[in-house]
Swiss-Prot record:
Changing R305A: Impairs heptamerization. GO terms for biological process: symbiont-mediated cytolysis of host cell. It holds the Pfam family APT. It comes from Aeromonas hydrophila. Belongs to the aerolysin family. Residues 68-84 are annotated as: Interaction with host N-linked glycan. The gene is aerA. Residues 1-23 form the signal peptide. Proteolytic cleavage and subsequent release of the propeptide trigger a major conformation change, leading to the formation of a heptameric pre-pore that then inserts into the host membrane. One of its GO terms (cellular component) is host cell plasma membrane. Residues 346-355 are annotated as: Interaction with glycans from host GPI-anchor. SMART domains: Aerolysin. This is Aerolysin. PROSITE patterns: AEROLYSIN (PS00274). Residues 446-493 form a propeptide.
């Protein structure tokens, strides 16, 4: 009995694993094909569509069928044409709806970015919207494939040629040239492609710099004093420690005014170049030009463990330095914008999901860049084209049937191609730091050396003290703040 129970449990587990392995996959209507080879028979590298798959894309299949057509599915099922309201039931037919055994999902390829040279905002926009090969033609063909009429000028028979580009407020309008007259229904009503709502987002990973000019360290101050041992025994178990805060002053210039429009999506840290230590941060969602200089403070320390003979003193020297660095820099900013198509849809076929045939005037806006919403996202609509009712805008399956999958993939890849603009300028920084604490040869104390000086630092009452003049105001003017000297017992004697 126990073995039977275990066997039954194994079958249940095996069945569950098989069910997981055979999870439903999307059926892309543009890859369906009708074979007239008999019930349940498909051509090479195709298989019959089953009942569940046909149900998931029922409206698409029925839309490709004749009024009273009946076509076969897998396992003895059939689907009936629009005259039968697309009913799916057991039955027989002489032809079969089939699907590839190795379907192509047909993702939109991602092309390398189109780089626009640095310039001010109008320069960058102008270069983009006047680029015939990389912008005007791809967007014109998008409008044409979606069913917009007259996407070309009067002096050319081809889509996207003889196009005029005009300034429109803060944006641009691309439209076929209307000079010289034309023939055809409403041929003067050219489709307009409006480009507007430009935005620029800094790409921190794109940082590059030119030749670095870095000065050798420059001595700005030498502090000299004494470590004094008033006791009758040598002192060697103490650390002399210099602590200070130093500021690094930095500035950047921006070559063009586009930097005022560029924002940082996330908190941004300036990359380190050379030996100058910086900790520059620009907050998220700030203009790149909002912070063109400042100062960062770092706390530093230096230590030495001197050996001072009995009733002796040794000279102590601390040298303070500064260093400069400068270089030209470049970042890239990701350019995003709205692409609005305005015109009337062709009566002979258009991709609006209801496929109107009364030549309606139609406006639709796509966002080229970061995702905003479903209605404006080409990639979202394309990826979800296999779900009837989810995409209530454009019928991308229709565009594939009319123009071919590879044609649509190529066109949409060019429309969605990332665009980047150069952000250039010059960066400079100055930092301060202390060199090592230097110790000289011991000198015997004079007979009156027990008289303490006001600026001495005691070594925990053990006879070791420091006599080193520190002018806080002077040191602050040199970029060194909160300067202190201390004598403490060594931790690892």
């Amino acid at each position: 009995m126990q073995k039977i129970k275990l066997t039954g449990l194994s079958l249940i587990i095996s069945g569950l694993l098989m069910a997981q392995a055979q999870a439903a996959e999307p059926v892309y209507p543009d890859q369906l094909r009708l074979f007239s080879l008999g019930q349940g028979v498909c051509g090479d590298k195709y298989r019959p569509v089953n009942r569940e798959e046909a149900q998931s894309v029922k409206s698409n299949i029925v839309g490709m069928m004749g009024q009273w057509q009946i076509s076969g599915l897998a396992n003895g099922w059939v689907i009936m044409g629009p005259g039968y309201n697309g009913e799916i039931k057991p039955g027989t037919a002489s032809n079969t709806w089939c699907y590839p055994t190795n379907p192509v999902t047909g993702e939109i390829p991602t092309l390398s970015a189109l780089d626009i040279p640095d310039g001010d905002e109008v320069d960058v926009q102008w270069r983009l919207v006047h680029d015939s090969a990389n912008f005007i033609k791809p967007t014109s063909y998008l409008a044409h494939y979606l069913g917009y009429a007259w996407v070309g000028g009067n002096h050319s028979q081809y889509v996207g040629e003889d196009m005029d580009v005009t300034r429109d407020g803060d944006g641009w309008v691309i439209r076929g040239n209307n000079d010289g007259g034309c023939d055809g229904y409403r041929c003067g009503d050219k489709t307009a492609i409006k480009v507007s709502n430009f935005a620029y987002n800094l790409d921190p990973d794109s940082f590059k710099h030119g030749d670095v000019t870095q000065s050798d360290r420059q001595l700005v101050k030498t502090v000299v004093g004494w470590a004094v041992n008033d006791s009758d025994t040598p002192q060697s178990g103490y650390d002399v420690t210099l602590r200070y805060d130093t500021a690094t002053n930095w500035s950047k210039t921006n070559t063009y005014g586009l930097s005022e429009k560029v924002t940082t999506k996330n908190k941004f840290k300036w990359p380190l170049v050379g030996e100058t230590e910086l900790s520059i941060e620009i907050a998220a969602n700030q203009s790149w030009a909002s912070q063109n200089g400042g100062s960062t403070t770092t706390s530093l320390s230096q230590s030495v463990r001197p050996t001072v003979p009995a009733r002796s003193k040794i000279p102590v020297k601390i040298e303070l330095y500064k260093a400069d660095i400068s270089y030209p820099y470049e970042f890239k900013a990701d350019v995003s914008y709205d692409l609005t198509l305005s015109g009337f849809l062709r009566w002979g076929g258009n991709a609006w999901y209801t496929h109107p045939d009364n030549r309606p005037n139609w406006n639709h806006t796509f966002v080229i860049g970061p995702y905003k919403d479903k209605a404006s996202s080409i990639r979202y609509q394309w990826d979800k084209r296999y779900i009837p009712g989810e995409v209530k805008w454009w019928d991308w399956n229709w565009t594939i049937q009319q123009n071919g999958l590879s044609t649509m993939q190529n066109n949409l890849a060019r429309v969605l191609r990332p665009v980047r603009a150069g952000i250039t300028g010059d960066f400079s920084a100055e930092s301060q730091f202390a060199g090592n604490i230097e110790i000289g040869a011991p000198v015997p104390l004079a007979a009156d050396s027990k008289v303490r000086r006001a600026r001495s630092v005691d070594g925990a009452g053990q006879g070791l003290r420091l006599e080193i003049p520190l002018d806080a105001q002077e040191l602050s003017g040199l970029g060194f703040n909160n300067v202190s000297l201390s004598v403490t017992p060594a931790a690892n004697q």
